[in-house]
Amino acid sequence: MTQNNANEAKGFYRLSWIQRIGFGSGDLAQNLIYQTVSMYLLFFYTNIFGLDPAAAAVMFLVVRIVDVIWDPLVGTFVDKHNPRWGKYRSYLVLGGIPLTGLAILCFWNGFSGSLLYAYVTYVGMSMLYTLINVPYGALNSSLTRDTNEITILTSTRMFMANVGGLAVSAGIPCLVAALAVGKVPAETIEMALFMGLGSLPSFIFMPLVPAIKRKVGKKNMFYIFLSVAIVGMAMLYIISRMGTVKENIVLIYIAQFIKSTGVIVATGYMWALVPEVISYGEYTSGRRISGIVNALTGIFFKAGMALGGVVPGLVLAWTGYKAAEQSSTLPADPDAWFRAMLIFALAGLALLIFCFTQTKERVVMDEKDVKDVKVSDLWTEFFRNRPLRVIALFFITAFAMMSVGNAAGAYFMNDLELQTPLAQEGIRWLVCVIPAILLVVAMFIISKYELEDDVIDEINREIENRAKTE
């Protein structure tokens, strides 16, 4: 038996590039759907659907509270069941079809101004997203134990995710404008470029992450890129006070690129920590409860999104933001928004199906342990697994930062100059100051993470040695 075959027999699988891309297409699909919701739904609700910003902010918080209850139920269900299409991959199709439908309905203006309709569609969409995202997250740790392969998988996944992010951030403004007025105004192109720069660094730096990590180490990589993001945010704040956005558009593009470089690498690589804490949990408890751990990470990032999601609406309401009626960069044509979401959601569904066809689970929980999984395992694992608690705080902080910045980006480029000085300052704080403060907190949190690569490799070898003696 060759060394590679021997390693694969122990669970240290090497994947082909088509398998890596297939796995990453699942995150691309989710970004086409969920990133559209995250970046533009608040704008759609306040400027087109007709909801009060404060009411929309409260709704975003309520949806995240529902997620806190729903996520552990999904994680437990996933760990306890083995659908015939695959323990984790089955849900890409089973959840993907209804998710597509509800995501489209979130951008339908048929019940304009109805808070009840907004709640029903948004809550339902979020619950279905969990039904895909939790097993998809567990799918990563089921493909291999090899830490280098997991790093490549994570880099590929985040590269693909940012393809989706670029399509959403730059593509949605242009597509909506084209569908609404038959052409894309120069102002819309400027906004699309600004939003698109949020994803562009992924294509440059995410393929380099494995090499960067080997050169400087895991923690130092986080410190470096979180600091880069803070510098970019400081530049955005200063430049936005030097004159109008249009007057300083090139400088704003540069600052946005710098900010996005730091954010993308740091928040992209954090997903590689999840398989590590799953292996650590298996090492300490003897059970590989991937669904439970990914349900926990789902709670963490949705808790961050809850905190980050409620902040923009409240800040906008407190500072007296008024929706622009005539000079807005983004069109207010409800039919154009509906058709744009229809296109993106259907593309996302096709990619989920492709991900399903290209993935194969190899490292999963033993059948004898499946029946013993229960919801309380979620909190048992949380309190037993110290590295899991560290990444919990990091996920909450990172996603709060991204949620605040993403939701406010459309306002920053769309109608900053049309607002009162107080409302302008509120938008600047949402885009620059609050996210920068959260990144400083994130740096302190990641300093407490203790699972270096040599420790994880030793843990995985010990797990395999135990399996051979049983």
Model-derived regions: residue spans:
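Membrane-embedded alpha-helical bundles of multi-pass transporters/translocases
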Residues: 2-470
